[in-house]
UniProtKB/Swiss-Prot annotation:
Protein name: Olfactory receptor 5I1
Cytoplasmic side: 49-56, 123-141, 220-239, 295-314
Species whose genome carries this gene: Homo sapiens (Human)
Localization terms from the record: Cell membrane
GO biological process: G protein-coupled receptor signaling pathway; sensory perception of smell; signal transduction
Signal peptide: none
Source organism, top-level taxon: Eukaryota
Disulfide bonds: 99-191
Topology with respect to the bilayer: Multi-pass membrane protein
Length: 314
């Protein structure tokens, strides 16, 4: 703690409460999340390498998917390693600046993922509804601009929230009832007025998710109309199945983010938030490679080709 000339001390570190359970359950949670971390590392790195080396996957859809895998990897790695350490350690502290950095990167990658998901939905809309214009509308230059704007948008949003959150004073209370440095539980510890922060969170923060979600819903609405016009039942079923799985993943991700960050502060419930946060910080990065790649014939064919070449060379 850092002492001031008033009757309080400023916080120099925070304690991440995490999931308070018996020690034997902490070991079980450690092993479970370690397994999920390994799955995400293998799945996302493998997918990025596959897209990189296979010439048949050099298309806008897989370009966006590669960036989504990268963001998922960074997003997950910002939170889970510290959480794994805390499962095995009695010291669950994180420095003031460490907390600021963790929240900054979390917010950056969370919003960047929302922008990329919106870009992917638009890409699918153009591919299915305007296939003759696809190569023109989704040229390499436009795809690069969309990705750069996604990262810039995520970074700008994160800078706003992080700056306003860490100019606040945190006095005496330093236990964050969460498994990472998230904004709602952090604001509860501040000894200064958080009205502006809560307004930013419920308006500016949620508007990013709402705008991206609207783009996704509109894109898939027009995709659905096009799918219904397909005469072949098998073709209609295949396209609808792929779109439905994508939309399910997006709805879970965007829905949980909107629930956490757009509701009034008086509805805040730390234990509920922790459970919901597990979905968008951990399970969605695990599910994305399964939803976007393992059900995709091109990716499976590319993976089989790489495996066959490895077997033949050995």
């Amino acid at each position: 703690m850092e002492f001031t000339d008033r009757n309080y001390t400023l916080v120099t570190e925070f304690i991440l409460l995490g999931f308070p359970t018996r020690p034997e359950l902490q070991i079980v949670l450690f092993l479970m999340f370690l397994t999920l971390y390994a799955i995400i590392l293998i799945g996302n790195i493998g997918l990025m390498l596959l897209i990189r080396i296979d010439p048949h996957l050099q298309t806008p859809m897989y370009f966006f998917l590669s960036n989504l895998s990268f963001v998922d990897l960074c997003y997950f790695s910002d939170i889970v390693p510290k959480m794994l350490v805390n499962f095995l350690s009695e010291n669950k502290s994180i420095s003031y600046y460490g907390c600021a950095l963790q929240f900054y990167f979390f917010c950056t990658f969370a919003d960047t993922e929302s922008f990329i998901l919106a870009a992917m939905a638009y890409d699918r809309y153009v591919a299915i509804c305007n296939p003759l214009l696809y190569t023109v509308v989704m040229s390499r230059g436009i795809c690069m601009r969309l990705i750069v704007l996604s990262y810039l948008g995520g970074n700008m949003s994160s800078l706003v929230h992080t700056s306003f959150a860490f100019i606040l004073k945190y006095c005496d209370k330093n236990v964050i009832n969460h498994f990472f440095c998230d904004l709602p539980p952090l604001l509860k510890l501040s000894c200064t007025d958080t009205t502006i922060n809560e307004w930013l969170l419920s308006t500016y923060g949620s508007s990013v998710e709402i705008i991206c979600f609207i783009i996704i819903i509109i894109s898939y609405f027009f995709i659905l109309l096009s799918v219904l016009k397909i005469r072949s039942f098998s073709g209609r079923k295949k396209t609808f199945s792929t779109c439905a799985s994508h939309l399910t993943s997006v709805t879970i991700y965007q829905g949980t983010l909107l629930f956490i960050y757009s509701r009034p502060s008086y509805l805040y419930s730390p234990n509920t938030d922790k459970i919901i946060s597990v979905f968008y910080t951990i399970f969605i990065p695990v599910l994305n490679p399964l939803i976007y790649s393992l059900r995709n014939k091109d990716v499976k064919d590319a993976a089989e080709k790489v495996l066959r070449s490895k077997v033949d060379s050995s």
